Amino acid sequence: MSKRDFYEVLGVDRSADEREIKKAYRKLAMKYHPDRNSDDPDAEEKFKEASMAYEVLSDKEKRSAYDRMGHAAFENGMGGGGFGGAGAGNFQDIFGDIFGNFGDIFGQSRGGGGRQRRGSDLRYVIELSLEEAVRGCKKEISFTAPAPCETCDGKGAKNASDIQTCSTCGGHGQVRMQQGFFAVQQTCPNCGGSGQEIKNPCNDCHGTGVKDKSRTLEVSIPAGVDDGDRVRLAGEGEAGGAGVQNGDLYVEVRVKEHPVFKRQGADLYMDVPVSITDAALGKEVEIPTLDGKVKIKVAEGTQSGKLLRVRGKGVTPVRTTMKGDLICRIMVETPVNLTREQKDLLRQFQDTLDGDSKHHQSPKKKSFFEKLGDLFD
């Protein structure tokens, strides 16, 4: 049994109330539950340690004894008198009090007196264009995963009469391991949590009830999904085997880069190139949107980097009704590959600007040199 202070194990003060103790245990149970940490051999021990601490500190009588005597309170008569009756209680009841009916948060479902395993969840990454993600679509996906054996219909046995209640766990799927004063439940080593024994296994799947199979599914992608969103297909994951629930399939969305638009939440962004003359004189410019072409007004004297908002031309994110906007960034283009005549005309035009500085025809330039003057005065 763990010799660490139980309050330290749960990370609570000695004055913590019942609510604080339950909250601390829930956090640790979520973090270290063996079903979520199959690749971490230390997680199960930490989970047991937290469970032991909670079993004592959540019970007023046990907590009082622990506060007076520490671990010594439970080192004598652990299996019989004293606190023996309470200590022999079902650990599953403790866990159920904390998590209610949310056993499948650990990839398992609760059934009968114990908790049965379920097949593993699967992940499939699907690439969509921006248009497909915004409007929604249907996609076919193909993958190979464990599926119910067709020979035995997923039962794992040649005949239904060959399936019997597990003699080790009595059909509960779990066995209780006594650790001194505490009782901790673990998956039954005989039936693997299914609660059943197969006396005459199927020759094709060797009693597992599953075989790898290539599958093709049609997935409905809802309108408005974004990069990283997931679509859950319940029961379409890995087959759990004989008497065990299937896992789920999670289709993860990857939105391909668009040549024109970039998405940020509900809004779309795009760069709109305009010539120097159009920016200086103003012009109505036609731009693309996901709903078709629209015109925007580039006002006279518009500077490069100016943002113009087109209302309602963005995206309606999934599970919302509010549509975003299209944000247009004006990019004033400097002409290149000018002829000699064009260069001369531009110099003449520049001379007219230099001679009429009182009208501030280059506001950014004026502001820049004013700041320089303030800096070096």
Curated annotation (Swiss-Prot):
The keyword Zinc-finger is assigned to this record: yes
Co-factor: note: Binds 2 Zn(2+) ions per monomer.
Gene Ontology biological process: chaperone cofactor-dependent protein refolding; DNA replication; protein refolding; response to heat
Primary residence: cytoplasm
Gene3D superfamilies: DnaJ domain, Heat shock protein DnaJ, cysteine-rich domain, Urease metallochaperone UreE, N-terminal domain
Annotated signal sequence range: none
Residues that bind Zn(2+) 2: 166, 169, 188, 191
Domain J: 5-70
Region (Disordered): 353-377
Repeat region (CXXCXGXG motif), residues: 149-156, 166-173, 188-195, 202-209
SMART domains hit by this protein: DnaJ (SM00271)
GO cellular component, one term: cytoplasm
GO-annotated molecular function: ATP binding; heat shock protein binding; unfolded protein binding; zinc ion binding
Keywords: Chaperone, Cytoplasm, DNA replication, Metal-binding, Repeat, Stress response, Zinc, Zinc-finger
Subunit annotation: Homodimer.
Function as written in the Swiss-Prot or TrEMBL entry: Participates actively in the response to hyperosmotic and heat shock by preventing the aggregation of stress-denatured proteins and by disaggregating proteins, also in an autonomous, DnaK-independent fashion. Unfolded proteins bind initially to DnaJ; upon interaction with the DnaJ-bound protein, DnaK hydrolyzes its bound ATP, resulting in the formation of a stable complex. GrpE releases ADP from DnaK; ATP binding to DnaK triggers the release of the substrate protein, thus completing the reaction cycle.
Protein name per the record: Chaperone protein DnaJ
Annotated organism of origin: Psychrobacter sp. (strain PRwf-1)
Lineage: Bacteria, Pseudomonadati, Pseudomonadota, Gammaproteobacteria, Moraxellales
